[in-house]
Amino acid sequence: MSRVLSRRDIADRIAKGQTIVIYEDSVLNLDKWIKFHPGGDKSIYHMIGRDATDEMNAYHDDQTITKFKIWKIGRIDYPWENMLPPIQGGRFSKIDERDDIGDYDINLTSKWRSVDESNQYTKIPKNDRLASEAEVKIYPKIPQGVVPSLDLKEAYEKKIVVDPAIVSENYDNERVYEDLTNFPSLDVKNQEWIASEYRKLHGEITAAGLYQCNYVRYLKEFLRIGTLFGISFYLLSLKWFAISAICLGFAWQQLVFIAHDAGHISITHNYQVDNIIGMTVASWIGGLSLGWWKRNHNVHHLVTNDPVHDPDIQHLPFFAVSTRLFHNVYSTYYDKFLWFDKFAQKVVPIQHYLYYPILCFGRFNLYRLSWMHVLLGQGPRRGKAAWFRYYELAGLSFFNYWFFYLIIYKQMPTNAERFKYVMISHIATMIVHVQITLSHFAMSTSDLGVTESFPMRQLRTSMDVDCPRWLDFFHGGLQFQVIHHLFPRLPRHNLRDAQSLVIKFCDKVGIKYSIYGFAAGNDVVISHLQQIAQQAHTMLECAKTMKKEATDTEFHTNKHVLAANVNEKRKQE
C-alpha cells in the first residue's frame, strides 16, 4: 500500500516544481508524462494541486483511465481541498522554508490581496518559476485560500479585495456578486455533493448507451457535405462563381463540426483513427490545424470563460467580454500581455456594432494561428501524437495548392474575381463563428475560486440553443454546448438524448440550465457586448476627465506660481 502524503508534503513537492495532480484518492506526479500528453501541457498545468477526477474522467476513455495510476506516488485518506495552481497565481513554499505552517494552512493567505498588488506585474526569474508558472506574477480575482461567499460583497465595498475606484472593477465585482447569489454555495461540502451527483449522472449517461456512436448519422453528414462540395465545383465549372463560393463556404462550415467531433475522440473513440479523420477534414480540406484547435480547446474546456486563462474569450483588441480585460491582463495561454491599447480603446466601445462584420474575417485569423502552430511546433513533440505535426503540414500545403492555386489562380479569369471568390467563400463561414461564440460570450466570466466544482463551472459559463430536431445538422452539436462541456466525448448525435437527464440533474442540484432560441441567444450576446462597451466608454471618459482636471490644476498652480514670482520681482524693484 502506498504511503499517505499530507497536504504539506504535496505542497512541498509543488514548490519543488513537480507536476502534482489528485485523482480519486491517488497523488499523481506527471513530470515524466507531461511532455507526451497529447492534450498539451497547459491543460495539465491548470490541474496542479487540484482534484482533477471529474475532468480526467470526462476527457479520457476507459482504457486511458486505467493507466492514470502508473504515475501514482502516494495517496490521500482525507477530504481534499483544492490548491490554486501556480499557473493561476498559486504560491507554494518548501517545507524547510516555512516549517511553522501547518498542513491545513499551507495554501491559505493570512490577509486579503491588497489594492496595490492587483495592478502590479513583477517578473519572476526563470530559475525561480514553478512548473507552469508564468514569467510574471498572476494575481487571481479570488485570493488564494479564500472560499467566495455573499460576505465578499462587503469586502468589495470596503476595497479589501480590489480597488472599486476603477469603474470597470465595480462592474466586475457586481457580476461576481450576482453569481454568488444565483448559484449554489461554494462551500467545499456543497460542491463535493454537486460533483458526486454529476458522477451519478455520468453513470446514467453511460448506462443508457449514449457513448455509442451512430455511424448512419455520420454517413448522412458526409453525404450532405460531399453534396455541397460537388455543387460548388459544378457551379465553378459553369463560371457561377458567387454561388459556387457560397456553397464552398457552407461545406467548410459543416466540415468544422466533423473536425470538432474527431478532436474530442467521439466518433470511433480510437485516438489515432479519430485524429486522422479530424486532421484530414480540417487541414487537407479546410486549411486549418486540428492540433492548434485541440491545444486551444482543451484549455478552454478546463478554465471556461476565465479572462486570464481561457483563449476562447481573449480577442483583444477587437472584443472584450469582461471588464477585467481592460487592465492589460497577462494571458497564461499565449504567455503574453493582452494590451488594452489605443486601438482596443477605439474598437471595444463599439464592439456590439462590429461583432458580425469582424466575424466575417474569422477564418483568415484561423489560417494564421494554424500555420503558427505547425511551423513553431507548438503541439506534442513526443509520444503518439508527435507525427501529427507533419501530417498537418502536408495537409495545409495541399489545401493551399488545391484552393489558392487550382481554384483561385487557375479558374478565376481576373484578380477581381479571385478576390470576390475568396471573400464570399470565407464570409459564408461566418455563421460557424457566431455559433461558437454564442455559447459563451454572454455567460459568466467570474473567477469563483478553486472550490467550484467542474459541473457547476461548466453550467455557469455555457448556454444551449433551442432548435427543432430537424435543424440539428445546421448547428452541428454546438447547440448543446452545456451538455458537451459536461461530457466532451459524447457523440454529437446523442447530445439531444442526454438533454433531459442533464435538466433533471440541474433541477436537483439547483443550478440554472441556460438555453435560448438562436435569435434570442444572439440578442443576449449583443446586449452583453453592449454592456461591456458601455463600461469601456465610461472608464475612458473618466480617465479623460481626470487627465483634464489634472492638467487644469497644474495650469492654475503654475499660473499662481508665475504671478507670485512676478509680484516678488516687482517688490524687489
UniProtKB/Swiss-Prot annotation:
Q: Which Gene3D superfamilies match?
A: Cytochrome b5-like heme/steroid binding domain
The short sequence motif called Histidine box-3 sits at: 481-485
Q: Where is this motif: Histidine box-2?
A: 297-301
Q: Which residues cross the membrane?
A: 228-248, 273-293, 353-372, 393-413, 422-442
- Which EC main class describes this enzyme? oxidoreductase
Q: What is its EC number?
A: 1.14.19.18
The residue ranges of the Cytochrome b5 heme-binding domain are 2-77
Motif Histidine box-1 at which residues?
A: 260-264
Cited Pfam families: Cyt-b5 (PF00173), FA_desaturase (PF00487)
Question: Which domain of life, per UniProt?
Answer: Eukaryota
Give the catalytic activity.
an N-acylsphing-4-enine + 2 Fe(II)-[cytochrome b5] + O2 + 2 H(+) = a (4E,8E)-4-sphinga-4,8-dienine ceramide + 2 Fe(III)-[cytochrome b5] + 2 H2O
Q: Which UniProt keywords apply?
A: Electron transport, Heme, Iron, Lipid metabolism, Membrane, Metal-binding, Oxidoreductase, Sphingolipid metabolism, Transmembrane, Transmembrane helix, Transport
Q: Where does heme bind?
A: H37, H60
Q: Name one GO biological process term.
A: sphingolipid metabolic process
Recorded topology in the membrane: Multi-pass membrane protein
* Any GO molecular function: metal ion binding
Q: Where in the cell is it found?
A: Membrane
Task: Give the UniProt family note.
Answer: Belongs to the fatty acid desaturase type 1 family.
Q: What does this protein do?
A: Delta(8)-fatty-acid desaturase which introduces a double bond at the 8-position in the long-chain base (LCB) of ceramides. Required for the formation of the di-unsaturated sphingoid base (E,E)-sphinga-4,8-dienine during glucosylceramide (GluCer) biosynthesis.
Q: Write down what this protein is called.
A: Delta 8-(E)-sphingolipid desaturase
